[in-house]
C-alpha cells in the first residue's frame, strides 16, 4: 500500500476527525484513524462506537488496502511539517513509512479489519438542509441542553421535522431554546434526539460550508452527509418532554431593551452576586430597568439603571445571571423583548430584529426566588 498526499490537506481532515476520538477508549483500536485506500481516494475514519465520522482526501496512488494508524502520533507529526507532499508506504510486518523532504519516519499499524464497521441505515427517512442553517440551529440551541446523566433525553437537541417547518429544541429544565425555520421543510414528519458530541463536531465544520447537508435517520441512528464528510451517530433513546406546555402563553408585562447594553450590565452586576445562586434582580417601572445583585456573605453589592421600554405592572423578578448572559449572548439582535407574567413564572426572550425571514427564536428562562 503506497500513496502520496499533501501534508496540509491530510492534517486539515484529520484535525476535524480527531474530535471524535475519546481520550480514554475501552477498545485500543479506537485510538487510531482508519485509512481505506482505493486508488486516488483515501477515506479516513474515526470512531468512539457511538459516533463515526469519515472524510475523503485526494491522493496519488495505484494501490488499495486498509490499515489503522495511531491518531495521536500522526497528528503530532503532521503538525510539524510545512506544506509538502508526503509519501506513505507500508513496509514489512505492520510498519508504515512516511517520507518527507526532511527524512523518514516509521509507525506501527494495525489491520483495517480490526476497526469497528460503520453502522448502515436500512431504508432511512431523508431531509436536506442548507449547511449554514443547520449550523445556526445547532449554535442557537446546544448551549441550553442539559448535562444530567439521569435524564439523558434532556442532554441532547430535539429535532422536529414537518412539512410546515423544522424545529430544534434544547432544555435543561432551567432554560429552554426553541429555534424554528419555516423556509426549510421536510417531506415527512419526524422526531429524534441528537446527542451533544456529534452536534458539537458538526457545529465546528458546518460554519465554513455553503453546501447542503443530507440527513438520513431511522429510530436508532442518524447520518449527516455534506462536502466530503459523512457522520453517523446513535440517537438518544427516549421521549422528549412536552416543551410547549412549559412556555407561558399569557405574558402581559413586556420589556424592550438594547441587547448589548443589557448583556454588559448583567455581566458586570453578576460579578457582585452570590457565587452559589448567581442571582440578579430586575426591577421594572415605566422607562427604567433596575439591575441589582448582592452577595451578603461578602458584603458585595451592585446596582445599575438602564433606559428601556416597559409595558405592564411594576414588578421585580430574579434570574440566574449565567443563564441570562448565555441567552443574550446567543442572540444577534440589536434589541430584545422579554415577556413576563409573575415573579414565579418563566420569562420569554425573543429578538426584535436581526432574524432571517422564516426564522424564529424563542428562549425561556426560569426565575429564581428573590431573597428580600
Regions found by a protein language model. Give the residues of each.
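Structural preference for solvent-exposed beta-strand-turn elements
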Residues: 1-372
Amino acid at each position: 500500500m503506497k500513496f502520496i498526499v499533501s501534508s496540509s490537506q491530510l492534517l486539515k481532515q484529520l484535525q476535524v476527525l480527531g474530535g471524535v476520538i475519546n481520550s480514554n477508549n475501552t477498545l485500543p483500536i479506537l485510538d487510531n484513524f482508519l485509512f481505506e485506500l482505493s486508488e486516488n481516494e483515501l477515506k479516513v475514519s474515526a470512531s468512539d462506537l457511538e459516533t463515526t465520522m469519515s472524510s475523503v482526501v485526494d491522493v496519488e496512488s495505484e494501490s488499495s488496502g486498509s490499515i489503522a494508524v495511531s491518531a495521536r502520533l500522526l497528528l503530532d507529526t503532521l503538525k510539524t511539517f510545512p506544506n509538502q507532499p508526503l509519501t506513505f508506504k507500508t513496509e514489512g510486518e505492520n510498519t508504515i513509512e512516511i517520507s518527507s523532504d526532511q527524512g523518514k519516519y516509521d509507525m506501527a499499524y494495525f489491520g483495517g479489519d480490526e476497526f469497528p464497521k460503520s453502522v448502515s441505515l436500512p431504508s432511512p427517512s431523508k431531509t436536506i438542509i442548507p449547511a449554514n442553517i443547520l449550523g445556526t440551529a445547532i449554535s442557537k440551541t446546544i448551549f441550553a441542553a442539559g448535562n444530567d446523566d439521569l435524564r439523558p433525553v434532556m442532554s441532547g437537541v430535539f429535532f422536529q421535522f414537518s412539512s410546515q417547518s423544522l424545529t430544534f429544541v434544547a432544555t435543561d429544565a432551567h432554560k429552554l431554546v426553541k429555534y424554528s425555520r419555516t423556509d426549510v421543510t421536510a417531506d415527512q414528519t419526524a422526531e429524534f434526539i441528537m446527542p451533544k458530541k456529534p452536534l458539537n463536531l458538526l457545529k465546528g465544520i458546518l460554519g465554513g460550508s455553503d453546501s447542503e447537508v443530507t440527513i438520513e435517520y431511522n429510530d436508532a441512528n442518524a447520518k449527516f452527509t455534506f462536502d466530503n464528510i459523512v457522520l453517523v451517530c446513535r440517537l438518544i433513546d427516549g421521549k422528549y418532554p412536552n416543551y410547549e406546555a412549559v412556555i407561558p402563553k399569557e405574558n402581559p408585562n413586556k420589556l424592550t431593551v438594547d441587547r448589548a447594553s443589557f448583556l454588559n450590565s448583567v455581566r458586570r452586576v453578576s460579578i457582585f452576586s452570590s457565587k452559589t445562586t448567581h442571582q440578579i434582580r430586575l426591577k421594572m417601572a415605566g422607562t427604567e430597568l433596575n439591575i441589582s445583585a448582592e452577595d451578603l456573605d461578602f458584603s458585595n453589592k451592585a446596582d445599575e439603571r438602564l433606559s428601556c421600554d416597559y409595558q405592564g405592572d411594576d414588578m421585580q423578578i430574579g434570574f440566574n445571571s449565567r443563564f441570562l448572559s448565555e441567552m443574550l449572548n446567543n442572540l444577534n439582535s440589536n434589541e430584545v423583548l422579554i415577556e413576563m407574567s409573575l415573579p414565579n413564572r418563566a420569562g420569554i426572550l425573543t429578538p426584535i430584529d436581526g432574524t432571517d425571514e422564516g426564522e424564529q427564536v424563542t428562549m425561556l428562562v426560569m426565575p429564581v426566588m428573590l431573597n428580600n
